[in-house]
Amino acid sequence: LGVDPGVRRIIKTKTEAMLVEQYKGKAPLLEANRQAFRLGYDWTREHVEPLGLKVERRDCVGDRIFVDGNSAAGLGAVYGGATVCAWYPITPSTSVAEAFMRYCRKFRVDKATGKHRYAIVQAEDELASIGMVVGAGWNGARAFTATSGPGISLMQEFIGLAYFAEIPAVLFDVQRGSPSTGMPTKTQQADLLCSAYASHGDTKHPLLFPEDPTECFEMGAQAFDLADRLQTPVFVMLELDTGMQDWLTAPFRWDDSRALDRGKVMSAEELEAGRDFGRYLDVDGDGIPYRTLPGTHPRRGAYFTRGTSKDRYARYTEEGAAYVDNMQRLLRKFESAKALVPGPVIDRAAKPTRAAAVWIAPTG
């Protein structure tokens, strides 16, 4: 590290600044590496002839930032109002949760009290992590997990529960080579079908496909609005190349006044006024029912959350008519989702053609 900038006559303090950033909070490591760098740099400047190359400082970056997609997604989760992350480490998604933790320490600490207004749990396995996410979402928190293909396989049961009980949840799926353990360090869009139809039965889930870190940030935030509005799991489908590679991109747009869209949540005032509440009533005809959050009203708005078949008032039933009614409503909700998710990007041919190509994400 000292020889290379010494030969190329790179300004010494610039490299030292990089060391300080790399070993921030690790004073013993910083000092040892700084001494090693100085020894190599000074010896090279004294004993080695400079290369016939000239190094100039140029601003070719402009106002762009250097960021990977996973970090952008983690920041997007903060921007989207997430306060709960439960996850289990798996390549290549681990850095989504790590980035969320890093940004929460900056943006989710109460300045007056110093209290941390977030919860991040490294669970014992993927099943526990998605279970925590579903529980937090039921309780009104914006919650997510980050995983990859094998994790999605293990989370199927809880994803189905969230779908059928209609509980918001967000899953960041950073895809890798599959099937089975596959190739953890290679990119692939291997999870499209298993995520789109995760769990058994007639399940269908909205999937978002970010193309670059900017969309990782934007869709990472948007996913939480969609999950709340649709009361369902929403998947953000990154892939290894998008998530782990560093990109040059324009600064993200951050609006402190951005309002969170919580969807159809009944207030205590509405319940007190005697408004009819049935957890699975399709009042508006769009398939999306109204929900209440625990503790909203002392006497009204309570219901059983079930993974079993139920009627419009969340009462257990195995009657065929009630089951068909519920499934048809879920289909209407999925149709309503089509108007809420981002549309496709269409590049039209310069001349009329009979062929078309369909691809997903930057390496599709």
Where are these regions (language model features)?
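Flexible, low-complexity linker and terminal segments
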Residues: 58-59, 66-80, 219-364
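A broadly conserved detector of short glycine/acidic/proline-rich loop/turn motifs that flank catalytic sites
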Residues: 175-176, 199, 212, 240-241, ...
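Short, flexible turn/loop "capping" segments at secondary-structure junctions
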Residues: 198-201, 349-351
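Thiamine diphosphate
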Residues: 17-197, 204-205, 210
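Short, well-ordered, mixed-charge alpha-helical segments that flank or form enzyme active sites
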Residues: 94-95, 178-180, 215-216, 243-246
